[in-house]
Amino acid sequence: MSELPVVSIFTDGACSGNPGPGGWGAILRFGDKEKELKGGEPHTTNNRMELMAAISALEALKKSCQVELYTDSQYVRQGITGWIHGWKRNGWKTADKKPVKNAELWQRLDAALKPHKINWHWVKGHAGHPENERADQLARDGVAMARMQKNVRS
């Protein structure tokens, strides 16, 4: 079996108001090739946009990959590496039997990572990490797009 191609993904989400217009951005890097993705929604939350950044990046991959995914969202990293296992066992309920917030996005993220081997990395936001800063700018572009129209993606 050949080794999986290694792809680095850098994601970020942003929201103007919480809830409010929001955007997400992602950078996918394979060797010396890069692809930028961004999108937004007119009425959303910062956590939903953080999830959409990771989902959209993973869904853009056309074959199984070894993914190094970098996010400044503890919500996404802790959710996907820890909390999700209990949620699935509990029928998408929290430990105190309440419905999981953003369950449909967590389920979509769970499905999007199935074909891949993923290492999740947390980076401190707004701390000068070049790719995180670029993903943040893409997310802010997504907010601007969302203010102008309905749900958008490019």
Curated annotation (Swiss-Prot):
Mg(2+) 2 binds at residues 12, 136. Its EC number is 3.1.26.4. Pfam families: RNase_H (PF00075). GO terms for biological process: DNA replication, removal of RNA primer. It comes from the Bacteria. Monomer. This is Ribonuclease H. It comes from Bradyrhizobium sp. (strain ORS 278).
